[in-house]
Amino acid sequence: MVNVEAISLYGTPNIGVYIFANDRFALIPYDAPEKLDRKIAENLSVDAFRVSVAGTRLVGIFLAGNNNGLVVPRVILDSELEHLKSLLDVNIVVLEDVRETGIGNLVLANDNGCVASQILPKSAVDRIADALGVECIQMSIGDVPFVGSLSVATNRGVALPPLATEEEIKSVEEALKVKANVLTVNRGKMFLRTGLVANSKGALVGEDTTGHEMMQLQRIFFQ
């Protein structure tokens, strides 16, 4: 039985802003409530590690990756980077030459492929592909460049917002080599990553998510 649970964090349903997760671990804010560790263990079946990025809680916005690697922004502090390296046995690449810092908003990846924002320079996309061990394409979704904040991918499926065109859905499926379908969370919100944290084992979703949205989420990732 796959677990999917609706929660809030810091009084908001926008839980994905604060959490990065894959099939091996989760990264959560340094001051997250202890019950979050338990929720992650119960639903995602991984251990949670407490970190900060640029001195903030915004782990989900700043980080992107898959089970092979992690991409971090130039604003990460040296001490934070060393902490990540001590915790994790994955490739970690810092995008020092990229002006944008919300890497989680710009990269959608699983272990089969990667979709990067057209905002990113080709040199950065090549470094991301190397770190994650996959091929990486660049595209927008519904003319919006923030492919990472609009979508959520695992090795079992991809959730895309309703503004994605049929052609874009097909392109994402070909890049990530899993089925994609449309979803909203938190009562119709289309920036899926802000309200959804998923891996191949389960998911956490914002507490405003409706029963219908939960059922669609189950269909996309766990059927």
UniProtKB/Swiss-Prot annotation:
A GO term, aspect molecular function: translation initiation factor activity
SMART domains registered for this protein in UniProt: eIF6
InterPro entries: eIF6 (IPR002769)
One Pfam family from the record: eIF-6
Keywords annotated in UniProt: Initiation factor, Protein biosynthesis
Tree of life domain: Archaea
GO BP annotations listed: cytosolic ribosome assembly
Function noted in UniProt: Binds to the 50S ribosomal subunit and prevents its association with the 30S ribosomal subunit to form the 70S initiation complex.
Family statement: Belongs to the eIF-6 family.
Protein name as annotated: Translation initiation factor 6
Gene giving rise to this polypeptide: eif6
